[in-house]
């Protein structure tokens, strides 16, 4: 860990992100990977677009009353994972950048807001997603499919952890193994 990396993004301080850093990270177009449970108990993971509302947006009356903020996902009408979440709302998800090692890891529940509807609340959220993932012309991607029903889920994190920088969390470090200390390995000594 002592050497410097060419990509300066790797030089971020090792540790948790601040609320501001989390907000900046979540505004980027990284895919959310959602894990839910099939009816037989097997895990199922799906990549999906997401929209993040931070706690202050929730407090200002966005319709979300989550204490940690919330994530919105929009499955298509025939998506199996929408049924999985409807039947068992327990889920986990991660949003990460494998180049910079930034990540947000969550555990929580999925709240069904709309079940397979056309022209619901999901449209405005999908437009925000399309801009973030596809750029200013992103909403034009939605136009030919606006007549197709979709679900809307609010993912409510009960646990939310963040990480940035190349390095180990101190809690993983085993002391007295004969190598450098955690601080030495992370250039903090």
Spans of features found by a protein language model:
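Charged, gly/pro-rich active-site loop segments
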Residues: 1-17, 99-189
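Short, conserved active-site entrance elements at the starts or edges of catalytic domains
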Residues: 4-37, 42, 53, 186-189
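Short, intrinsically disordered, mixed-charge
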Residues: 86-91, 127, 131
């Amino acid at each position: 860990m002592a050497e410097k990396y060419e990509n300066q993004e790797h030089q971020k301080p090792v540790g948790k992100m601040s609320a501001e850093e989390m907000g900046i990270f979540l505004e980027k177009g990284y895919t959310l990977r959602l894990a839910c449970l099939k009816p037989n108990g097997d895990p199922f993971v799906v990549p999906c677009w997401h929209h993040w509302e931070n706690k202050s947006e929730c407090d200002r009356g966005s319709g979300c009353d989550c204490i940690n903020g919330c994530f919105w996902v929009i499955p298509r009408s025939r998506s199996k994972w929408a049924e999985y979440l409807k039947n068992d709302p327990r889920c986990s998800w991660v949003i990460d950048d494998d180049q910079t090692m930034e990540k947000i890891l969550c555990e929580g529940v999925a709240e069904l807001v709309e079940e397979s509807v056309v022209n619901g609340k999901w449209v405005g959220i999908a437009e925000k997603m399309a801009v973030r993932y596809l750029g200013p012309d992103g909403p034009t991607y939605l136009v030919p499919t606006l007549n197709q029903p979709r679900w809307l889920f609010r993912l409510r994190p009960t646990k939310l952890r963040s990480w940035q920088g190349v390095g180990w969390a101190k809690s993983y470090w085993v002391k007295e193994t004969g190598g450098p200390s955690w601080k030495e390995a992370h250039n903090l000594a």
